[in-house]
Amino acid sequence: MLPYNQKMFADELNELGTYWLEKLPNVSFEETLLSCLTHRPYGTQPGHAYFYYPQKYGYGEVWIRMAKELAPQVLYGMEAADLDCEKRRVRTKTGEVFEAEHVITTVPWHSFTQITGMPRDIRGLLAELRSSAIETRYVPKCLSTKAQWIYEPDPQIPWHRILVRHNFCPGSRGYWLETRKERVQMLEDISVKFPGNAEDNAGRNDILLNGSDHGDAGYHYLNEYAYPLNTIGKPEAMNRLLAFCRARQIYGLGRWGEHCHYNSDVVVELAMQMARRLLQS
């Protein structure tokens, strides 16, 4: 795992805490070996061992249906810029101003241009929050593999993970390359071959198109806020930040509001729990 994590986090790997390991199965060497031999899971499963998504459609279906129910209260194309903690006021980058009894923020805290009404020591916590940027790039071809996810620890290969879409979702085509922002340029220059014999690399070399193919593969998007990093001291910093804001009816929610590595199914559950609490208050 070390080569993969060095590739994922680069120099930031040494800044990470250990509290996030609760997301991983707790297994011994014997249990790992037994899992490989029997093709069955062993060991203690993490708190989030199962993922819950709609049985039909994609997980985006949740947001599509919510938007229909909430329209016209849903406003698109507006980006929050300033937050006033005393007045519970949000100003967008285009100048619109909103005030509310309760403010729920799901955006990265360090993406606000300005936060007022917050003491300097609390505001200083924002500088401690770290995140990574990831490019997702679509390649319109199929791979000769039955895998849904492929993890790539080789530092000579730009991407760290592949979502094999045609195995993941019935009727779909192609696959997605996930590449850390700092390694994206390598996609344009790639001209490598995997080491080892052909049998070991069955399906692996299919991924290596030439540089022009990757450059013109199709849709690609750089997400500047892909993952919050679980750095040392982050839980304590977020507890202080969220407690201060909560006392002023401002709530951080979800992956970015809580700066916690949640998947979307967990965020939906947390949002429903918060809605119930606010309705009862």
Model-predicted segments: where are they?
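Active-site/ligand-binding neighborhood in enzyme catalytic cores
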Residues: 1-88, 106
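Aromatic-acidic/polar surface patches that form glycan- and anion
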Residues: 52-59, 96, 128, 260-267
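General small-molecule cofactor/ligand-binding pocket signal
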Residues: 73-77, 216-219, 251
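Mid-domain catalytic core of redox enzymes
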Residues: 81-88, 92-207, 219, 237-244
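Conserved strand-to-helix beginnings and helix N-cap segments that scaffold or border functional pockets
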Residues: 187-190, 231, 264-265
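Active-site-proximal substrate-binding core of FAD-dependent oxidoreductases
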Residues: 220, 279-281
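FAD-binding beta-loop-beta segment adjacent to the flavin cofactor pocket
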Residues: 223-259
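A conserved FAD-binding loop/helix module that cradles the flavin
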Residues: 253-279
